[in-house]
Amino acid sequence: MNEAKLKDGERVNQLFSTDVKIIQNSEVFSYSVDSVLLSRFPKLPQRGLIVDLCAGNGAVGLFASTRTKAKILAVEIQERLADMAERSIELNDLTQQMQVIQDDLKNLGRYITGSKVDMILCNPPYFKVDKKSNLNESQHYLLARHEISTNLEEICKIAQRILKSNGRLAMVHRPERFLDILDTMQAHNLAPKRIQFVYPKLGK
């Protein structure tokens, strides 16, 4: 474990039930239980390449690193979050396994050509932008939660393009988008093989 390089407002947290530590900032971004659920849901490939789309501060990839030896490529559009992810990777001495790309998903073809990805992990923005949208959040949370810089259509299109023929996409999303997810996946020749609904508490 290396020494943490912290900036104003940042703290180091230990990831749930692991020895991995992560740099967080409540005003910018902090991981939620969705990241834990996503990283534990799929059977991860033990070799090859895993790509974490909409990576935020790197929580999903860091969680996944405890369960696989595969290379993990975390892609995040926001410079501040990508920087936090990079420093968390250094903090945990994972630079040989994990790498961060700070760029728009629209430019992913610059970094990954062809169908060579074994698994995609994705905790995407959940909410469509419409007249009812609450757009008064901080810019960091706004981009993380709302389909402004990317959307479900683009994520499925990317998955169709970069996954190997036997590759898999694991995604966490809101139940009210379920039918939309199925339709969008089908439009891009993706078929759900396993679905798990998660309830916040018994009886909900």
Range-by-range predicted roles:
Residues 3-45:
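Class I SAM-dependent transferase core
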Residues 23, 99-101, 193-196:
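General small-molecule cofactor/ligand-binding pocket signal
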Residues 41-122, 128-133:
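Conserved SAM/SAH cofactor-binding pocket of Class I
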Residues 124-154:
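Mobile active-site "lid"/loop adjacent to the S-adenosyl-L-methionine
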Residues 149-200:
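Conserved Class I SAM-dependent methyltransferase catalytic core
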